A protein has these predicted regions:
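Conserved alpha-helical positions within TPR/SEL1-like repeat arrays
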Residues: 1-12, 35-46, 69-80, 103-114, ...
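Short, intrinsically disordered, charge-balanced linker/junction segments flanking boundaries
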Residues: 219, 223-228
Length: 228
C-alpha cells in the first residue's frame, strides 16, 4: 500500500520513472493488487509505452474482471496501437459493466468512426450525451460523424452545443467553420477559423482552412498570410 501511495505521489509531481519503480515494488509484494496494475498501466500510457500499458491493464482485468475504467483505458491504448476491433471489444466490455460510462460510449464512437461505421458511431455519441448532456467533446464528435454523413445542418448544431459548453474549444470552432464553409456561409466560416486560431495560434489546420476560405472570398492577400 505504501509503495502504491508513493507511486501516486511521484506521478502527481511528474516523476514517471520513479512512479513505475514504486508501483513495481508494490506488485512485488502484492502481485494481485488490481489497482496498482491499473495505475502502472496509466503511467506507461503517459510514457507512451503502449505495449507495456496493455499488459498492465490486462493484468488488472485478470484479477478484477469488472474493472470498467481499466477496460476503457485498455480500449484507448489498443486504439492508439491501431488494434481497432480489439479496442471496440474493450469499450463494449466497459459499457456492459457500467452502462452509464459516458467516456466509454464516446471512445467507442471514436473507434467505430475510424472503422467507417458512422451510423453506429452516431449512436454511441448519442448514448454518451444522453448520460452526460454537457459533454463538449461528445457534441463535437457527434458533429464530426454527422458531417461525414453529409448532415451539415445537424453537424452545425452539434458544434454550436459544444461551444456553448466550452467557448475555448478550438477544434469545435474549426469544425464549425468547415461545416459552414460547406454550406457556403464563408464569412461565418472565416470567423470560426479566426476564433480557433485566437485560442490556439499554432493550429495549422485552422490556418490552412482560413486561407482557403479567404481565397474563396477573393481576399487573396489575407489568404496568402494565412498560408504563411
Amino acid at each position: 500500500l505504501l509503495y502504491n501511495i508513493s507511486g501516486i505521489c511521484y506521478k502527481t509531481i511528474g516523476k514517471l520513472d520513479e512512479t513505475v519503480k514504486s508501483f513495481e515494488k508494490a506488485l512485488a509484494i502484492k502481485p494481485d493488487y488490481a489497482e496498482v496494475h491499473y495505475n502502472l498501466g496509466v503511467t506507461f500510457q503517459e510514457l507512451t509505452q503502449l505495449d507495456a500499458a496493455v499488459k498492465s491493464y490486462e493484468k488488472a482485468l485478470a484479477i478484477k474482471p469488472d474493472y470498467a475504467i481499466a477496460c476503457n483505458n485498455l480500449g484507448f491504448t489498443l486504439q492508439k496501437l491501431g488494434q481497432l476491433d480489439a479496442a471496440v471489444k474493450s469499450y463494449e466490455q466497459a459499457i456492459t459493466i457500467k452502462p452509464d460510462f459516458a467516456d466509454a460510449h464516446n471512445n467507442l464512437g471514436i473507434t467505430l468512426k475510424k472503422l467507417g461505421q458512422l451510423d453506429a458511431a452516431v449512436k454511441s455519441y448519442e448514448q454518451a450525451l444522453a448520460i452526460k448532456p454537457d459533454y463538449a467533446e461528445g457534441h463535437n464528435n457527434l458533429g464530426n460523424a454527422l458531417y461525414d454523413l453529409g448532415q451539415l445542418d445537424a453537424a452545425v448544431k452539434c458544434f454550436e452545443k459544444a461551444l456553448a459548453i466550452n467557448p475555448d474549444y478550438a477544434e469545435a470552432h474549426n469544425n464549425l467553420g468547415n461545416a459552414l464553409n460547406d454550406l457556403v456561409q464563408l464569412d461565418e466560416a472565416v470567423k470560426c477559423y479566426e476564433k480557433a486560431i485566437t485560442i490556439q495560434p499554432d493550429y495549422a489546420e485552422a490556418h490552412n482552412n482560413l486561407g482557403n476560405a479567404l481565397n474563396d472570398l477573393g481576399q487573396l492577400d489575407a489568404s496568402i498570410k494565412s498560408f504563411e
